[in-house]
A protein has these predicted regions:
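Rossmann-fold NAD(P) dinucleotide-binding segment
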Residues: 65-75, 79-101
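Rossmann-fold NAD(P)-binding glycine/threonine-rich loop
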Residues: 83, 88-90, 103-123, 134, ...
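Short, ordered loop/turn segments at secondary-structure junctions
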Residues: 104-106, 128-130, 157-159
Length: 249
């Protein structure tokens, strides 16, 4: 499966390293805003031997259309920003290139665009693409269904410079139908990401906790999603769509 990666920040780099390790995927190229590292290869950047091209391009000098003409891919993985979808979405959808977006925050306008693109190709979006946190969300919804009256609080912890409430915490609150004021945020040091859902019963407490140890967790999530989207028809998918069949008895 040929992959194009949008975004090469800390998380993008971690995702790229995981893709290079998996022989089911071929990292064809990386597109980023900066001209730093332009025309170098990802394997060279990591100092590893690989047959995968993984060439790095700058969006200021190379258009997505030009890139897809020269190096067609099956899937585009987006770890850039909420604005990124405007640079490649329409072109990718026209060419039936699958889209996996791991952008934590989208405005309503971008969400509507994703729905529009899903009429032409397979689109997946999750504000947190790690497997573990989506297992947590799945289990939390199940518990809420059993005890809809239970008190629920959400705690989230991230690195010092992360601004605003995490998209994952917001999604958890929305999925459990609780007020966003029930989200408690901590910013300290280099915490990659930790989410805790507390269910307060009268005589007992249930805590569901997920903690990302390193950003490679996002890469493992990408691999899982890409494998499960391979035979999916056009449409807009989320993690619940992919996980539900695994829980069917």
């Amino acid at each position: 499966m040929k992959i194009g990666l949008i975004g090469f920040g800390k998380t993008g780099k971690s995702v790229a390293s995981i893709l290079l390790e998996n022989n089911k995927f071929c990292l064809e190229w990386v597109l980023r805003q900066s001209t730093v590292l332009e025309h170098r290869s990802v394997p060279e950047f990591f100092g590893v031997q690989s047959d995968e091209p993984g060439l790095i391009y700058s969006s200021s000098k190379t258009s997505i259309e030009e890139l897809l003409n020269k190096h067609p891919v099956d899937v585009i993985i987006d770890f850039s920003s909420n604005e990124g979808i405007y640079t490649y979405g329409e072109i990718a959808a026209e060419r039936k290139v699958k889209i996996i977006s791991a952008i934590s925050h989208y405005k309503e306008k971008e969400l509507q665009l994703l729905k529009k693109l899903a009429n032409k190709t397979t689109v997946f979006w999750s504000p947190n693409i790690t497997l573990g946190v989506n297992y947590l969300l799945f289990a939390a919804k199940f518990l809420k269904k059993i005890a809809p009256w239970v008190d629920i609080e959400v705690n989230e912890e991230h690195f010092k410079k992360k601004q605003g409430t995490s998209g994952t915490a917001v999604k958890i609150a929305e999925a459990l139908d609780i007020d966003k004021n029930n989200i408690n945020s901590v910013r300290a040091g280099g915490i990659v990401g930790k989410h805790e859902v507390i269910f307060g019963f009268p005589y007992q407490t249930v805590r569901l906790i997920h903690e990302s140890i390193s950003r490679e967790a996002f890469g493992n999530g990408v691999v899982f999603v890409a494998e499960n989207l391979e035979n999916k028809q056009k449409g807009l998918y989320n993690f619940e769509d992919i996980l539900t069949p695994y829980f069917t008895v």
